[in-house]
């Protein structure tokens, strides 16, 4: 049985977080005063402390993560690695695998269809896919981060927004390609600690047909497009501040700063399609959340010590992971 990422955009957008996302308010007119630009930290940084979830003598230590993080930061991971080495299990964020009986050459044959799926199915340019006001906002951000790119104008709004967001992060010395999980995974492997990845598997009988169906499906993705633009227009300095706060271990700043995220809105645009619904993907985020909580329950029952990784925006809030763990009767202590 081979695994094949049928909807790479879904996996990227939906599963960085498993709880409901905070919405981003529509952009306000830019102030006439100049705001000082936040400088992004670099070099060796300690990172934050861990949340402690406990019952009796069993502890679950949760490292809250932030995305993006400073691109040129090196995390001083020794303290957490030593905790992993003393623990019985390392619990990852929930993940999804799309399983299909597809061989190597068959997967290669699917690439052209997957590439076509990035573009608007009716061939209309981006300008005709979104409102005039929204397109003007797009042009401002495009000029800033993408320059004169013409190919991007063929993309679906959700794909264009994703590319714009990636380039904006890079230009601001931020990155979503962090090595946090990689470092902890290597530590667990080195110390023979059990690693658990809570997984939801989607079975796809005919990936070629599914991709073709997706390529001809019109998405309701203007909200994703607008939310991404708003994030870049209004949240970039806070984004840097959150990244810096994580790097230097300022937990209070992480708690105080807002955590807007456009990925939930963008994921909804993809998961609401008929092609996703027919294949059991419409409630995927709820499935992933439930699977992680189930794995956490099991770890707390059988292990004296477990280390877990979870996005901070998924941990916090009335409907966050920490609230769910409190409802289950666990004691939750914030990092010092």
Stretches with model-predicted labels:
Residues 4, 77, 289-293:
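Short, well-ordered alpha-helical scaffold segments within catalytic/effector domains
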Residues 5-14:
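Bacterial N-terminal signal peptides
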Residues 6, 54-56, 301-302:
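Short hydrophobic "helix-edge" motifs at membrane interfaces and signal-peptide entry regions
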Residues 18-22:
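Boundary at the C-terminal end of the N-terminal hydrophobic targeting segment
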Residues 24-41, 47-280:
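Structured, acidic catalytic/metal-binding patches in enzyme active sites
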Residues 270-336:
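A cross-kingdom marker for long, charged
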């Amino acid at each position: 049985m081979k695994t094949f990422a049928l909807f790479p955009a879904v996996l990227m957008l939906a599963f960085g977080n498993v709880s409901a996302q905070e919405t981003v308010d529509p952009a306000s007119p830019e102030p006439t005063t100049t705001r000082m630009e936040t400088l992004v930290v670099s070099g060796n940084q300690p990172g934050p402390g861990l949340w402690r979830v406990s019952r009796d003598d069993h502890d679950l230590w949760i490292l809250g993560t932030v995305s993006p993080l400073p691109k040129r930061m090196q995390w001083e991971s020794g303290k957490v690695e030593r905790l992993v080495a003393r623990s019985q299990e390392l619990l990852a964020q929930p993940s999804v695998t799309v399983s299909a009986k597809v061989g190597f050459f068959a997967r290669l044959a699917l690439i052209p269809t997957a590439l076509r799926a990035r573009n608007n199915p009716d061939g209309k340019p981006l300008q005709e896919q979104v409102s005039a006001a929204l397109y003007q906002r797009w042009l401002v951000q495009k000029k800033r981060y993408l320059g004169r790119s013409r190919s991007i104008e063929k993309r679906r709004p959700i794909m264009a927004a994703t590319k714009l967001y990636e380039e904006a992060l890079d230009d601001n010395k931020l990155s979503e390609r962090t090595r946090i999980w990689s470092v902890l995974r290597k530590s667990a492997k080195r110390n023979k600690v059990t690693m658990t990845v809570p997984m939801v598997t989607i079975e796809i009988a005919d990936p070629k047909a599914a991709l073709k169906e997706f390529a001809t499906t019109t998405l309701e993705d203007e909200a994703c497009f607008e939310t991404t633009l708003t994030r870049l227009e209004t949240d970039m300095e806070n984004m840097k501040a959150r990244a810096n706060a994580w790097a230097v271990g300022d937990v209070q700043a992480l708690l105080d700063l807002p955590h807007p995220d456009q990925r939930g809105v963008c994921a909804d645009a993809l998961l609401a399609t008929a092609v996703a619904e027919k294949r059991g993907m419409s409630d995927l985020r709820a499935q992933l959340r439930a699977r992680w909580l189930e794995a956490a329950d099991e770890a707390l029952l059988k292990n004296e010590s477990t280390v877990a990784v979870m996005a901070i925006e998924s941990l916090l809030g009335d409907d966050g992971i920490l609230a769910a763990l409190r409802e289950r009767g666990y004691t939750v202590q914030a990092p010092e």
